[in-house]
C-alpha cells in the first residue's frame, strides 16, 4: 500500500468488527514508520499471529508494536491506563521491545473504574451488547465536556477535583440504575489509582497530531489503525447496536489530529464471510448448524470478551456501503481459508424489503432486521489454501470467489489472507 503517492494509509473494518485488522496492520507495519490508533478503547481486540506458535492480543496498543514501529494512541481513543500498562508489561515479558516505542495523546480521555460500573449497570437494563469496559460512559463524559484527559494529570490537584465530581455524579446515576452500595464508585480509590499511574503515564504523553504531522513532513510512512468496524460506527452503523465512536475513515483525521487531505489511501478489511458479536441485525446470518461450523473453523470467539460470534455469509450490501462511507481505495479479504471445505458458498448480493428489491443499507435498524437477503451461490474449491502466497496459487474457484467479492464490493482487492500467521498473506499487485 505504501509508495510515492501513498504515505498515509488508514486501515478500517468494513463489516461489524473482528475482520482481521490486527493481522493486516501487522503486515503493513513492516513498512510503516509510525502506527496510530485513532478511536475505540480497551473494547478492541486485535489478534496477531507472528508465527512459531506466538500469538498476541492487543486491546489499546497499536498492532505495529510487534513490528518495531513507533506507536501512538491518538486523542480519539478512550484510554484505560490500568489496562494499558498491564498490556505493556505483558508484551515486555514476552520479549517485545516497547521502550520509547509508545506515545499517548495528552488529549485522550481516560476510562476510569466508575465508567465500567456505569457501563455494566446500564447493560443490565438495555442489553445493547457492550463489552462492559466503560467505553460508552467515557465517550459520554467526553462529549458532555466533563471528562478527565491524560494531560489533566499534569495538575493532580485539578485532576482530583474532576475525579471527585465525576464519581459523585456516577454514584447518583448508579443509584438510579438500581445499583447497591457495593456497586458504588469510591473516589479515594480512584485518586490513589491515578496518583500511582500518573508518573508512568505522563512521560508517554505527547501532542499526537504534531507527532504525526512531523513524521509526514519528514517523508515517513504513517499507518492509522481503526478499531471495530464501519457497521458499528455511531453515525453510520446499525444504530443503536453500535459502539460510541466514529469507526469509519472520517474518524481517523479527527482522532489523530491531522487534516483529511493528509490521508492518501483507505484499506477496508473484510472477512470472506460475515460475523458480528452481540445483538443487532445480521441479514446474512446462517442457519445454526452452518453458523456453528463456520464458528469452529474460523475460531470465531471474541478476543476481548470470549463471546461466540454470530456467523453468516458475505454480505455485498454491507461492504458496498462500507466502501462508500469510508471512501475505500482497496480491500483486504481475510479468512478465505475458513471456507476451504464448503462445496457451495452463498453470497449475499442484495435485499428484499416489503416485497421490493433494494441494493443499499436502510437507515433504521427495524428495517434492516426485516430484510430478506438475496443470494447467489458460487462453487467452493474444497482444497487447502494455507500455502498460497500468490493469486496464481489459488484454485480457480477460490480465485473466482475473490474476483466476485471485488466486483460486488466495488473496490479492488489488495490483500488476501489464507491463515492466521503473518506470512499467510497474498499481496495483489
What are these regions (language model features)?
Residues 1-429:
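Non-transmembrane, aqueous-exposed alpha-helical and coiled segments at domain scale
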Amino acid at each position: 500500500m505504501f509508495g510515492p503517492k501513498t504515505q498515509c494509509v488508514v486501515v478500517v473494518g468494513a463489516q461489524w468488527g473482528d475482520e482481521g485488522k490486527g493481522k493486516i496492520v501487522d503486515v503493513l507495519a513492516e513498512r510503516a514508520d509510525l502506527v496510530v490508533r485513532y478511536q475505540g478503547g480497551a473494547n478492541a481486540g486485535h489478534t496477531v499471529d507472528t508465527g512459531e506458535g506466538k500469538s498476541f492480543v492487543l486491546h489499546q496498543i497499536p498492532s505495529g508494536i510487534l513490528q518495531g514501529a513507533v506507536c501512538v494512541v491518538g486523542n480519539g481513543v478512550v484510554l484505560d491506563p490500568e489496562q494499558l500498562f498491564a498490556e505493556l508489561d505483558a508484551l515486555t515479558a514476552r520479549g517485545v521491545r516497547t521502550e520509547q516505542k509508545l506515545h499517548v495523546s495528552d488529549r485522550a480521555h481516560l476510562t476510569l473504574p466508575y465508567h465500567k460500573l456505569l457501563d455494566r449497570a446500564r447493560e443490565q437494563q438495555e442489553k445493547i451488547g457492550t463489552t462492559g469496559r466503560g467505553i460508552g460512559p467515557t465517550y459520554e463524559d467526553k462529549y458532555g465536556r466533563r471528562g478527565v484527559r491524560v494531560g489533566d494529570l499534569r495538575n493532580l490537584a485539578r485532576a482530583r477535583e474532576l475525579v471527585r465530581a465525576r464519581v459523585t455524579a456516577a454514584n447518583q446515576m448508579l443509584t438510579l440504575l438500581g445499583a447497591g452500595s457495593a456497586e458504588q464508585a469510591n473516589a479515594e480509590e480512584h485518586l490513589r489509582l491515578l496518583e500511582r499511574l500518573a508518573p508512568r503515564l505522563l512521560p508517554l504523553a505527547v501532542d499526537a497530531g504534531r507527532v504525526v504531522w512531523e513524521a509526514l513532513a519528514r517523508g515517513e510512512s504513517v499507518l492509522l489503525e481503526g478499531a471495530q468496524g464501519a457497521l458499528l460506527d455511531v453515525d453510520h452503523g446499525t444504530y443503536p447496536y453500535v459502539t460510541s465512536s466514529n469507526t469509519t475513515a472520517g474518524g481517523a483525521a479527527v482522532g489523530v489530529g491531522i487534516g483529511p487531505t493528509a490521508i492518501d489511501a483507505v484499506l477496508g478489511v473484510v472477512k470472506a464471510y460475515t460475523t458480528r458479536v452481540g445483538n443487532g441485525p445480521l441479514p446474512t446470518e446462517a442457519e445454526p448448524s452452518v453458523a456453528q461450523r463456520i464458528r469452529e473453523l474460523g475460531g470465531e470467539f471474541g478476543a476481548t470478551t470470549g463471546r461466540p460470534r454470530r456467523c453468516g455469509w458475505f454480505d455485498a450490501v454491507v461492504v458496498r456501503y462500507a466502501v462508500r462511507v469510508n471512501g475505500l481505495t482497496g480491500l483486504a479479504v481475510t479468512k478465505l481459508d475458513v471456507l476451504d471445505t464448503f462445496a457451495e458458498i452463498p453470497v449475499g448480493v442484495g435485499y428484499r424489503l416489503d416485497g421490493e428489491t433494494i441494493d443499499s443499507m436502510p437507515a433504521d435498524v427495524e428495517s434492516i432486521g426485516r430484510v430478506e437477503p438475496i443470494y447467489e451461490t458460487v462453487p467452493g474449491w474444497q482444497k487447502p489454501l494455507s500455502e498460497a502466497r500468490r493469486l496464481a496459487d489459488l484454485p480457480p474457484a477460490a480465485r473466482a470467489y475473490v474476483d466476485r467479492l471485488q466486483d460486488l464490493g466495488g473496490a479492488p482487492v489488495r490483500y488476501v489472507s489464507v491463515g492466521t500467521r503473518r506470512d499467510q498473506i497474498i499481496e495483489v499487485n
